[in-house]
Amino acid sequence: SACLVGSEMCIRDRSKGHALILPKSHAANIYELSDEMAAKAMILAKKMATAMTAALKCDGFNIVQNNGECAGQTVFHFHMHLIPRYKGDQVGITWHPGELSDADKEEILLKVKEQLS
């Protein structure tokens, strides 16, 4: 892979055109990322996804960002994967949602709201 840091593309091989957004300043994960860098990363992700979709003629697009080992994080420097998708590409980014009761959903919502206030 040809990796450059900052707003340059880091080309990977998961899918034709798979790239990374990799900030120059270190943050191990999203929790350590400054609000300013988080905003810049998302704005760049939108611009790159739009340009890559037009350039590569892909059928869809995934933007993936993992935090913590159990979530699949293996590189402990914040980064976002930009993954162009093509019909029949067999790239495996799927999960099977569980089911929660309305009471469980409400409890989760209340706990998160408490942390936000």
Model-identified regions with their sequence ranges:
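Single conserved hydrophobic/aromatic residue that forms the stacking wall/gate
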Residues: 1-6, 11
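Divalent metal-coordination and catalytic microenvironments
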Residues: 7, 23, 41, 79-80
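Short histidine-centered catalytic/ligand-binding loop motif
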Residues: 20-42, 94-101
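Long, well-ordered alpha-helical scaffolding segments within enzyme catalytic domains
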Residues: 35-55, 103-114
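A short glycine-rich, hydrophobically flanked beta-strand micro-motif that places a catalytic Asp/Glu
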Residues: 57-68
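Acidic pyrophosphate-coordinating catalytic loop
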Residues: 68-75
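C-terminal helix-cap and adjacent tail motif
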Residues: 84-117
